[in-house]
Swiss-Prot record:
Pathway of action: Cofactor biosynthesis; thiamine diphosphate biosynthesis
Keyword terms of this UniProt record: ATP-binding, Cytoplasm, Disulfide bond, Nucleotide-binding, Redox-active center, RNA-binding, Thiamine biosynthesis, Transferase, tRNA-binding
Compartmental location: Cytoplasm
Organism: Escherichia coli (strain 55989 / EAEC)
Active-site feature positions: 456 (cysteine persulfide intermediate)
Record-given protein name: tRNA sulfurtransferase
Annotated ATP binding sites: 183-184, 265, 287, 296
Residue ranges of every copy of the Rhodanese domain listed in the record: 404-482
GO cellular component, one term: cytosol
Pfam entry (one): THUMP
């Protein structure tokens, strides 16, 4: 079998040296991706296309599908390459190939020709089109908007009968641009923004700020692995997970409510910039869209950018949510995003939409930056190829209950402000307060002979924290959902 790879048009308008470099990189990317399907396949580059030849017919569909997801490819032609002698021979071969497709349909013939011949492309179109029209009674020629277009390519003494055309994702080959670090949360925005930078030729590494235990991290790892495996598997990339719970706890304890959102984002950018510098990455990528939430106003984004010299790319800055969700659906991350737990631990009651630099800096003076340095230093860095094996490992489960036993105690893990606003009172059972950001250090001080039922309003944080405690060896925890 043979495929002809057509280049993304923006590649073809580059200077000769740049075009050759892009084609060389794309050829290498294709080899890296397809070697898993057929180690004997051949990938041959030309000035205006790339040929892929493979022997294993059982892998035809898999190879074709993989090619449509490699950045830099405009479209793929599945072809049959045969010799020919003259125009009548071309017609006879086209008749055998296309007769069944043209029965009862309107059609036209389009020919591309390279080499020296005693006929032109138009001559072949007329001859083959007239012959097909005569020999297939139910078919008729229609040059504009036909139901079937017969594509033929003539190159020297070879005829390419095009059996199918399949659209690629376009863009530039990965590796033609410099590396970036995507701040991925597993939601709609960060997945789409990561894809857009891969499509533009960047090798995308991933940085995840873990705010809620292993279950959340496993979900985000699956999203990152899916994106890499589907669109970027030609290159090795890193997945860096940073345990940000200590940072969140420090913010909740010391920072003014209205400034929390902006300061949390500033801390994330600081941490991600340190990671980027460590690995020689040139830019950060976020899924922020202008005005989508309070921290994404121009004033706040400018303040967030100010904490780092690292370039921050926001490919979705002018996109609305519906457009982003549609893109997520196209690339296959929508289902991941819909089921991803939404972290609700740092939500200000009255977040500022126009933060003042002096106020932000004054609040940050209360923050212990050694905590930030420590979590970055302890960041977990893994090769994304290892994630598939790791996520297959059994995840600790936690029981959810809606009633009480004689030894049970409800543990309200909401922030102090939330508890003061809406105190939890349940008849017939004790309620103890311990904010989620103190669980890792204070839960061990509680009476371990009791069974602790973790509770928060949405049930997301309580489940994540219960999973975390189970992983730490505390088996006396459950989730309370009335």
């Amino acid at each position: 079998m043979k495929f002809i790879i057509k280049l993304f048009p923006e590649i073809t308008i580059k200077s000769q040296s740049v075009r050759l470099r892009f084609i060389k990189i794309l050829t290498g990317n294709i080899r890296n991706v397809l070697k898993h399907y057929d180690e004997t396949l051949a990938v041959v580059r030309h000035w205006d296309n790339i040929e892929v030849r493979a022997k294993d017919e059982n892998q035809r569909l898999a190879i074709r599908d993989a090619l449509t997801r490699i950045p830099g490819i405009h479209h793929i032609l599945e072809v049959e390459d045969v010799p020919f002698t003259d125009m009548h021979d071309i017609f006879e071969k086209a008749l055998v190939q296309y007769r069944d497709q043209l029965e009862g349909k309107t059609f036209c013939v389009r020919v591309k020709r390279r080499g020296k011949h005693d006929f032109s492309s138009i001559d072949v179109e007329r001859y083959v089109g007239g012959g097909l029209n005569q020999h297939i009674e139910s078919a008729r020629v229609k040059l504009t908007n036909p139901e079937v277009t017969v594509h033929l390519e003539v190159e020297d003494d070879r005829l390419l009968l095009i059996k199918g055309r399949y659209e690629g994702i376009g863009g530039f080959p990965i590796g033609t641009q410099e590396d970036v670090l995507s701040l991925i949360s597993g939601g709609f925005d960060s997945g789409v923004s990561s894809y857009m930078l891969m499509r533009r030729g960047c090798r995308v590494h991933y940085c995840f700020f873990n705010l809620g235990g292993a279950a959340h991290e496993i979900g985000v790892r699956q999203v990152a692995h899916y994106l890499w495996n589907r669109f970027g598997s030609s290159h090795r990339v890193r997945f860096v997970a940073i345990n940000f719970e200590p940072v969140v706890g420090e913010i909740l304890e010391k920072i003014d409510d209205g400034q929390m959102g902006v300061i949390l984002k500033r801390m994330m950018v600081r941490a991600a910039s340190k990671v980027a510098e460590r690995y020689g990455v040139q830019a950060l990528v976020t899924g922020e869209a202008l005005g989508q939430v309070s921290s994404q106003t121009l004033t706040n984004l400018r303040l967030i950018d100010n904490v780092s010299d690292t370039l921050i790319l926001r490919p979705l800055i002018s996109y609305d949510k519906e457009h982003i969700i549609n893109l997520a659906r196209q690339i296959g991350t929508e289902d991941f995003a819909r089921t991803m737990p939404e972290y609700c631990g740092v939500i200000s009651k009255s977040p500022t939409v126009k933060a003042v630099k002096s106020k932000i800096e004054a609040e940050e003076e209360k923050f212990d930056f050694s905590i930030l340095d420590k979590v970055v230093e302890e960041a977990n860095n893994v090769d994304i190829r290892e994630i598939a094996q790791q996520t297959e490992q059994e995840v600790v489960e936690v029981e959810t209950v809606n009633g009480f036993g004689p030894n049970d105690v409800i543990l309200d893990i909401r922030s102090i402000d939330e508890q003061e606003d809406k105190p939890l009172k349940v008849e017939g059972i004790d309620v103890v307060s311990l904010p989620f950001y103190k669980l890792s250090t204070k839960f061990g001080d509680l009476d371990q002979n009791r069974t602790w039922l973790l509770w928060c309003e949405r049930g997301v944080m309580s489940r994540l924290q219960a999973l975390y405690l189970r992983e730490q060896g505390f088996n006396n925890v459950k989730v309370y959902r009335p």
